C-alpha cells in the first residue's frame, strides 16, 4: 500500500514521549501501521497573520505540486510505452524509491535554507516546480508531434489493401511507365471474387491489354492486382470495376515521392530514438526534483498547521504512518482516542460528512491532530 498519513501531535514532557506513545499505540502493540518519526527542522515561525495566510497558500501549492509530480510520472509511463514495473524503476527521489525517501526524509538545507522565511521557502518551491511544469509542456509537445507524425506514416503502411500505402508493396516492373497511351492501374480484388476478376477484367472496358493482370500482394480478405489499359478507357474501367466489387486504388508510381516518404520515415524514426534517451533522463531528474519539493511542501504544511493549532513555543512531534489497508478504520479510532482531548470540535462522530465553517476541509478530513495524506500511487494505467 502506497499511502502515508503524515500527522503531528503536541510534545508532552518531551517530543520523544509523544513519539513513543504513538508508536506503541499504532505499531508496537497491534501492528496497525508502520510508523516512523518525520524530521522537520526548526523553521522561522513569523507572525500569526503570515501563518494563517500561508496555510491557505500552502494548500494550493500542495495541490499544484502534486499535479506536476503526477504529470511527470504519467508522461514517463507514456514515453516508456512499457510495463508498470519498468516505469516504477525510474520513479525515484534522490536516487532511492519513494517509500524509502519519505520514511527517511531529511530536509534539504541547500535547496531550502531554513534561515529563509517560510514564505520565501514556499516561493522557492513554487518557482522551481512551475519551471518543471513549463519545461514538461514544451518537451512533451515536441516529442508528441514527432511521435504523432511517425505514427501517421506507420499507419499508412499498415491496415488493409483498401487503405494502406502501396508504395512499399509495388515495384517499378509492375507498371508500364512513360507511355503516352497506356497506363497501369492497381485494383483491390476480394478473394471471394478473384475468379470473376480473372474472367472479366479484360472485358470490363475497351482497350484493356490482354493478360496484363498479376497478383502483386494479398492480405486476409483481398488481392492487389495490376492491369494495363489505354488511358482513355480508365474512367469507364473504374466505373465497371466498382459495379463488380473491384476497387481501383488512386496510385501513381513516382520514385521521387516514394523515396522522399521513406526518407521522412527514417528521419522521424531516427529523431525519436535520439530524443528518447535525453527525454527519459530529463523526466527522471525532474520527477525526483518535483517529488522532493512535494514532500517539503507537506513538511511546511505540518509545521504551519501545528504552530497554528498547538501554539508557541514550537513543541510538536511530526510522525509518519504507513497504514495497513485492512485496519485503517481501527487506526483512525486509535488515533482519535489518543488525541481527542486536543480539540472539542472533533469529539463528534469521526467520519460525519459535515462542513465546519471557516475550514476548507469537510468533517471527514478533520481530526483533532494535524493530518495530511501522501498518496504515492501516482500512475493511472488505462
Curated annotation (Swiss-Prot):
Top-level taxon of origin: Eukaryota
Tissue: Expressed in brain (at protein level).
Compartments (UniProt record): Cytoplasmic vesicle, Secretory vesicle, Synaptic vesicle membrane; Cytoplasmic vesicle, Clathrin-coated vesicle membrane
Gene Ontology terms, MF aspect: proton-transporting ATPase activity, rotational mechanism
Gene3D superfamilies per UniProt: 3.30.70.100, subunit c (vma5p) of the yeast v-atpase, domain 2, Vacuolar atp synthase subunit c, domain 1
Keyword line: Acetylation, Cytoplasmic vesicle, Hydrogen ion transport, Ion transport, Membrane, Synapse, Transport
SUPFAM superfamilies attached to this UniProt entry: Vacuolar ATP synthase subunit C
GO biological process: pH reduction; proton transmembrane transport; synaptic vesicle lumen acidification
Alphabetized InterPro entries for the sequence: ATPase_V1-cplx_csu, Vac_ATP_synth_c_sf
Positions of post-translational N-acetylthreonine modification: 2
Listed Pfam families: V-ATPase_C
A cellular-component GO term for this protein: plasma membrane
Membrane topology: Peripheral membrane protein
Primary location class: membrane
Quaternary structure and interacting proteins, as annotated: V-ATPase is a heteromultimeric enzyme made up of two complexes: the ATP-hydrolytic V1 complex and the proton translocation V0 complex. The V1 complex consists of three catalytic AB heterodimers that form a heterohexamer, three peripheral stalks each consisting of EG heterodimers, one central rotor including subunits D and F, and the regulatory subunits C and H. The proton translocation complex V0 consists of the proton transport subunit a, a ring of proteolipid subunits c9c'', rotary subunit d, subunits e and f, and the accessory subunits ATP6AP1/Ac45 and ATP6AP2/PRR.
Family that this chain belongs to: Belongs to the V-ATPase C subunit family.
Function according to Swiss-Prot or TrEMBL: Subunit of the V1 complex of vacuolar(H+)-ATPase (V-ATPase), a multisubunit enzyme composed of a peripheral complex (V1) that hydrolyzes ATP and a membrane integral complex (V0) that translocates protons. V-ATPase is responsible for acidifying and maintaining the pH of intracellular compartments and in some cell types, is targeted to the plasma membrane, where it is responsible for acidifying the extracellular environment. Subunit C is necessary for the assembly of the catalytic sector of the enzyme and is likely to have a specific function in its catalytic activity.
Name of this chain's protein: V-type proton ATPase subunit C 1
Organism of this sequence: Bos taurus
Gene symbol of the encoding locus: ATP6V1C1
